[in-house]
Amino acid sequence: MQVILAKHAGFCFGVKRATQLAFEAADTGSETYTLGPIIHSPQVVQRLEEMGVIPVEDVSEVETGGTIIIRSHGVAAEELEAAVRANLEVVDATCPFVKKAQEHVATLSKEGYDIVVVGDAVHPEVQGIVSYAAGRVYVVSSDKDVERLPRMSKIGIVAQTTQSFEHLHDVVTACLARGGETRVYNTICDATAVRQDEAKKLAGAVDCMVVIGGFNSANTKRLAQICRELLPRTHHVETACQIDEQWFKGVEKVGVTAGASTPKWIIDEVIDRISAIDKDKIS
């Protein structure tokens, strides 16, 4: 059974940078916290906890003088301000692509634009982006949501960094159809687009797909969705222990990809587990 790994599976630049900052902070031996999970990988969060880097939900949980790391998804503007007011040492591990989306929203809002964010309203990245708007701001998950928005004379559009280009295009088209001045910033991460494109091609060339990543990871869930639309025999796992031999009955080629928050050691473990399966002995 041939196992084919997508070229760009695993950590993207922003996640690699965030985890590196977190592990460097852990090596100092000082009390270190992350505001929320540093990335959407329970296994990485657990490993950091074992090294003394503890996730907290609120700045008030950290004593004055402590170190707090801003997660890769970013945080709300008021949370960052609260950390500064509390005299904490702030290590900002916000992904540069997310930071750019925050900056665009702040600028557009000051220029009188109503903001439309394309994404998942409950995702921490989107909640952080929204907080930088000084005026009206709306989160839409699809072009159908645009129909429910009020009329706007000036619309500024940004996207959650893990959205697909097709999704952003559909929302922009729907906004343009309503009239008014529209300014769009493509804030989708290049790594997201590359991974999604690779996943489509790989899913079309194999008998079964395995997508590795946190079940709470938006970009991993999106990869699994994209693959499943092309290949129903697609399975989303977090770790190797979740692999089921029955998935590979009659399979000649297995495609493997992984979300941007998935560390290399987990990818290697999953591939080793799949490679050890003798498909001819599956009953």
Curated annotation (Swiss-Prot):
GO terms for molecular function: 4 iron, 4 sulfur cluster binding; 4-hydroxy-3-methylbut-2-enyl diphosphate reductase activity; metal ion binding. Its EC number is 1.17.7.4. The active site is at residue 125. Pfam families: LYTB. Pathway: Isoprenoid biosynthesis; dimethylallyl diphosphate biosynthesis; dimethylallyl diphosphate from (2E)-4-hydroxy-3-methylbutenyl diphosphate: step 1/1; Isoprenoid biosynthesis; isopentenyl diphosphate biosynthesis via DXP pathway; isopentenyl diphosphate from 1-deoxy-D-xylulose 5-phosphate: step 6/6. (2E)-4-hydroxy-3-methylbut-2-enyl diphosphate binds at residues 40, 73, 123, 161, 217, 219, 261. It is an enzyme of class 1 (oxidoreductase). [4Fe-4S] cluster binds at residues 12, 95, 189. Coiled coil: none annotated. Dimethylallyl diphosphate binds at residues 40, 73, 123, 217, 219, 261. Its cofactor is [4Fe-4S] cluster. Binds 1 [4Fe-4S] cluster per subunit. Catalyzes the conversion of 1-hydroxy-2-methyl-2-(E)-butenyl 4-diphosphate (HMBPP) into a mixture of isopentenyl diphosphate (IPP) and dimethylallyl diphosphate (DMAPP). Acts in the terminal step of the DOXP/MEP pathway for isoprenoid precursor biosynthesis. Belongs to the IspH family. PANTHER family: 4-HYDROXY-3-METHYLBUT-2-ENYL DIPHOSPHATE REDUCTASE (PTHR30426:SF0). This is 4-hydroxy-3-methylbut-2-enyl diphosphate reductase. It comes from Geobacter sp. (strain M21). The gene is ispH.
